[in-house]
Amino acid sequence: MKAIGLPDDLIQKGKDIKGVSEVVQEGKHFKVTITTGSKMETMTGEKVKTVVRMEGDNKLVTTFKGIKSVTEFNGDTVXNXMTLGXIVFKRVSKR
């Protein structure tokens, strides 16, 4: 998290937080439409334009500011891995 510019207090808040995310899928439309440009907000609050690609039937992939984000849906599990160089951040959630 430090590698993407998050200060220590936000890193600690991220470790302590228990959140709920809503994911709604209608065909190839999630909150973004696959393969079209969309604006996303980074963990530092910066808004960036990126393209989200769908790989297979259950994986969303995008790259922004040198970070590769892969979100995979398997049954009731949502796994997200973000990679910056040799640093990998993984989060697993339940639907």
Swiss-Prot record:
Assembly, in brief, is:
Monomer.
Residues modified as N6-succinyllysine: 13, 18, 28, 39, 47, 59, 90
Report the protein's function. This protein binds free fatty acids and their coenzyme A derivatives, bilirubin, and some other small molecules in the cytoplasm; it may be involved in intracellular lipid transport.
- Phosphothreonine: which positions carry it? 33
- Mind listing the UniProt keywords for this protein, alphabetically? Cytoplasm, Lipid-binding, Phosphoprotein, Transport
Query: What is its subcellular localisation?
Result: Cytoplasm
Name it.
Fatty acid-binding protein, liver
Q: What Gene Ontology cellular component terms go with this record?
A: cytoplasm
InterPro entries found in the cross-reference section: Calycin
Tell me the protein family, please. Answer: Belongs to the calycin superfamily. Fatty-acid binding protein (FABP) family.
**Domain of life of the source:** Eukaryota
Supply one GO molecular-function term. Answer: lipid binding
